[in-house]
Amino acid sequence: MITSLERFTNLGPSSINDLEMERDFIRDTLEVLRATGEISNDAFLDAGTIQGGLSLLLNLLTQGITEAEASLQLNSLKERAGSLSRTYPDLDSKVESMRK
């Protein structure tokens, strides 16, 4: 999941579409990985915080927060994704393997 977030550096109104696509990719991928038993329910629920964080970030961007505020939110999500990578070492590679 950290790989997904590392794609984003500067956020602003022009990045809303890309963030929406990434959020949807993460949501759909996590559902498939859980349904096929490739990740545990705990990993699914914990990783859902990244999807939720992206949704929050999207809402804030549409409300016009500054790029600095958006960067703070993104950095917080990256820290959470790093923690997830330590807890579930294979999660990032499993998510990325689903990318077309």
Enumerate the predicted regions with their spans:
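Exposed, low-complexity/repetitive linear segments and helix-based recognition motifs
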Residues: 3, 17-19, 25, 43, ...
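Amphipathic, soluble alpha-helical interaction motifs
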Residues: 29-32, 36, 57-60, 87, ...
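Short, flexible coil/linker elements and helix-boundary hinge sites characteristic
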Residues: 10, 37, 63, 88-89
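Short terminal alpha-helical segments
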Residues: 1-36
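Amphipathic alpha-helical binding modules
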Residues: 65-100
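Amphipathic protein-protein interaction modules
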Residues: 40-79
